[in-house]
Amino acid sequence: MVAGILRSARRIVVKVGSSLVTNEGRGLDEAAIGEWSRQLAALVRGDAGAAREVVMVSSGAIAEGMKRLGWVGRPREIHALQAAAAVGQMGLAQMYETKLREQGMGSAQVLLTHADLADRERYLNARSTLLTLLRLGVVPVINENDTVVNDEIKFGDNDTLGALVANLVEADALIILTDQKGLYTADPRRDPSARLVRQAKAGDSALEAMAGGAGSSIGKGGMITKILAAKRAAGSGASTVIAWGREPDVLVRLVAGEALGSLLVAQTQKTQARKQWMADHLQLRGSVVVDAGAAAKLRAEGKSLLPIGMTAVEGDFARGDVIAVRDASGAEIARGLANYAAAEARMLCRKPSTEFEKLLGYSAEPEMVHRDNLVLAAGS
């Protein structure tokens, strides 16, 4: 099972936590980051098989900031932690940029908050940017924007962020690197009879009972946050592997199909999960009417909706809102996330993408609704 899932994964999110990225909290572990960068580059280049698109979610900014500021212990005051994050993020980004460049790879720093992914317009902007970076062969290095929010420092973790990013880019797999070999039936540091869980269903309630409590004083996430992250990633069809980050060539060996760590299998296909998400959680804000040619292509081929095929726009919606796509008779063909607000969409009706910049003053997506954000109506 692990061989099939990881071998076939073409888009992967890798999350690495503070306890691995840092030298026991005393700044960044340069050798470890260099080693993961080497493996990331191998995956992107396809050194041992098919080329992959890889996103890195990395903690470590606060620990690096503490080192640069000369602090021995982790402060409790929120604004001190935010200041440390601001100082340390400089070093974290620089370290990844240096190590990936040594491997001939480009990198990009992306700072996100949970609010960015909860807002539909910002969600689409973040998604478009990340997918563009992946198409360019660049490795995005993502961290929580600790300087402007409190939630991650106080309660949250980058395991959750890793799962949200997996959902955002529709990853095939999430790999969480940790300081444990994987998920055990009990805490192996306290129970010598604890056994490694090789494979389970993501979302199995029994896993949470096994997971135990909080993590180290360096990071905030324990095994329970990884279980919950795997459950969240499974909601969009991504399976999760929890593995020891110090295992030699761990990433390369995983994508080659070697059974390392614990595999938590998603039970939902990606397309099914996306349909369920759009059907259950998003409110219809407006609609566009399309001509017969566009309607036929949508129904038969599931193509993206281009403005040139639109004849009318109904309602007042914003970029990122859910809209219906209707034929001339009013029958609903599909629903999807709008790349343009209603006022802009009206300007783009019947227009080719080559005219967008002249009409809008900027050039963005060529589609009104991208096929990845489009769900055909039942019976279409």
Swiss-Prot record:
PUA domain segment(s): 285-363
GO cellular component: cytosol
Pathway(s) annotated for this protein in UniProt: Amino-acid biosynthesis; L-proline biosynthesis; L-glutamate 5-semialdehyde from L-glutamate: step 1/2
Catalytic activity: L-glutamate + ATP = L-glutamyl 5-phosphate + ADP
UniProt superkingdom: Bacteria
Keyword Kinase applies: yes
Binding site for ATP: K15, T178, D179
Cross-referenced NCBIfam families: proB (TIGR01027)
Chief location bin: cytoplasm
Ranges that cross the membrane: none
CDD domains noted in UniProt: AAK_G5K_ProB, PUA_G5K
Functional note: Catalyzes the transfer of a phosphate group to glutamate to form L-glutamate 5-phosphate.
HAMAP family, sorted: ProB
Name this polypeptide is given: Glutamate 5-kinase
Family recorded in the similarity comment: Belongs to the glutamate 5-kinase family.
EC number of the protein: 2.7.2.11
Gene Ontology process terms (BP): L-proline biosynthetic process
Provenance organism: Verminephrobacter eiseniae (strain EF01-2)
